[in-house]
Regions:
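Active-site beta-to-alpha loop of glycosyltransferases that engages the nucleotide-sugar donor
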Residues: 11-13, 408-419, 440
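Short helix-capping segments at alpha-helix termini
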Residues: 428-430, 454-459
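Short, well-formed alpha-helical segments that are part of the catalytic scaffolds
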Residues: 20-21, 413-426
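Cell-envelope/extracellular polymer assembly enzymes that use nucleotide-activated donors
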Residues: 402-405, 433
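Metal-ion/cofactor- or nucleotide/acyl-coenzyme-handling active-site neighborhoods
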Residues: 2-399
Length: 478
């Protein structure tokens, strides 16, 4: 197989792309006869080691047979005649390259890896494994075998699905020993919570936060290893990323990896696969809950409980949503935004709307098959709001040691919260507690309440509505 990476026009671009090429292609190094980097200058110095990449990349570089090929005229595409694949680093040239390919009837495939302009450049890099002769079919057979040997024996009645939303904080003291816990994503960082929950399945799927070349992803993978040591369990990954994890994770984890296939491209209206044990694949969606957790739960159990899938108000569209700091890697967010600039240029409300569409339809599909879905923590997501239970809230009840409990429902009151709370919290000569219930405010009410709670831990308790949204539900929660 002969591949090229084009164009590289500056030293800084070379230093930026070399780590990506090594990270994604190192697992396939034995399949390449040629791996050329087409540079428009003469390379006279060593590459810089950049801190925001996983440092194992630079140790593996010496094992890659990469050649620098001078190409001073970046619009001279004649080198394409000798290649099978070209990895395009500048998507502005995609049209010109495609015209040249068509003109000369070339069979070469263009793989678009411009991480500054494309949101899914890294997914295209990851999916290159599907091009390797026979490897793709081998991985699908591994997937089928492991689903049957590792996933199928875990069938039980109750399944608990954990997300990483802020409201997951209400749920960590509950006893889940009567069912199977499926945890996900950055929950790996909190070993105390992992030991408490004892998940039997851990699911990960993100192309940049989990399978990418950044130091953020490196920290995630190190935590994944540490999590596995204290809690050995099945780890479900996309078949797309299986070569990454089977190459870079320790050998003692490989037998526990279960790759599951999802088809790309996929239309939103295509059906859900809610029996993985029969179909050995899932529908492509944009979130771990709908991609892996709910399909696994529907395949293994009858009662499905959801925790920590908070969603967000539509008005707060500067990011996907908020996370519980206890289960989130927060010290390297700036790093991953540098390494994957294009990924963060997505329109977050469009992503959110699609997520709502997938949840609504997947929940309906699962329930049509006789399964029950119960949401155990407050959520802005309408299908989860409708299925809320206060089962978790019961475990938060304490013997009343106050003479008076004041229940205060709140909705979009950011202008008045400080004034009202100061009045209520400064009352004298009475033993009381103040319980404030946020009814899914779309302004900054909840953030202000949580800040006040930290300053008044003995007297103020803040919850979101554990019932259907509305005044009655908020009062009932209190």
């Amino acid at each position: 197989m002969k591949i090229g990476i084009f164009p590289i026009t500056t030293y800084s671009q070379l230093d930026d792309f070399i780590p990506r090429v090594v990270w994604y292609l190192y697992p396939f190094r034995d399949w390449f006869s040629i791996c050329n980097l087409y540079v428009s200058f003469k390379v006279k110095k060593k590459n810089k080691c950049l801190e925001h990449f996983d440092q194992i990349i630079y140790r593996n570089f010496k094992h890659m047979n990469i050649s620098y090929v001078s190409n001073s005229n970046i619009f001279d595409f004649s080198f394409l005649f000798g290649l099978d694949y070209i990895f395009l680093t500048n998507d502005l040239m995609f049209r010109e390259l495609s015209i040249f390919k068509k003109k000369y009837n070339l069979s070469i495939e263009i793989i678009r890896i411009d991480h500054e302009r494309l949101s899914y450049a890294d997914s295209f890099f990851l999916r290159f494994g599907e091009k390797i002769p026979n490897l793709y079919e081998k991985y699908k057979q591994i997937s089928k075998n492991k689903i049957l040997s590792l996933i199928k024996p875990l069938k039980t009645n109750k399944i608990y699905l954990f997300g990483t939303g802020p409201n997951s904080k209400y749920a960590f003291d509950y006893d889940y020993s009567d069912g199977l816990v499926i945890a996900c994503n950055s929950m790996v960082i909190n070993k105390d919570i992992i030991v408490k929950l004892k998940p039997k399945i851990f699911v990960i799927a993100d192309p940049i936060f989990h399978a990418g070349p950044s130091s953020y992803a490196a920290e995630f993978r190190q935590n994944l290893i540490e999590m596995f040591i204290v809690n050995p369990c099945v780890i479900v990954v996309p078949l797309r990323d299986y070569h990454i994890y089977s190459t870079y994770l320790p050998s003692f984890m490989i037998d526990f990896l279960v790759p599951i296939f999802f088809k790309i491209p996929s239309i939103d209206e295509s059906p859900f696969y809610i029996d993985i044990l029969k179909y050995f694949e899932v529908k492509t969606t944009n979130n771990i809950l709908t991609l892996f957790q709910l399909p696994l739960a529907a395949s293994l159990g009858n009662e499905i409980y959801i925790i920590g899938c908070d969603g967000r108000p539509k008005s707060k569209d500067s990011y996907f949503w908020s996370h519980n700091d206890k289960v989130q890697i927060i010290n390297k967010m700036d790093v991953i935004k540098v390494v994957h600039k294009g990924f963060f240029q997505i329109k977050y409300n469009e992503y959110y709307d699609k997520h709502m569409y997938f949840i609504k339809n997947l929940v309906k599909t699962i329930e049509k098959h006789g399964k029950q879905i119960i949401n155990l923590t407050p959520s802005y997501i309408p299908p989860l709001q409708k299925r809320i239970s206060d089962l978790i809230l019961e475990t938060n009840r304490q013997k009343n040691i106050c003479d008076l409990s004041i229940i205060l429902p709140i909705y979009n009151m950011q202008k008045y919260i400080e004034k009202y709370l100061n009045f209520l919290l400064n009352m004298q000569d009475i033993n009381y507690e103040l319980i404030v219930i946020d009814d899914f405010s779309e302004d900054l009410s909840l953030e202000l309440l949580l800040k006040q709670e930290l300053q008044n831990v003995d007297r103020l308790k803040v919850y979101q509505n554990f019932n259907k949204n509305g005044l009655y539900g908020a009062i009932k929660t209190g």
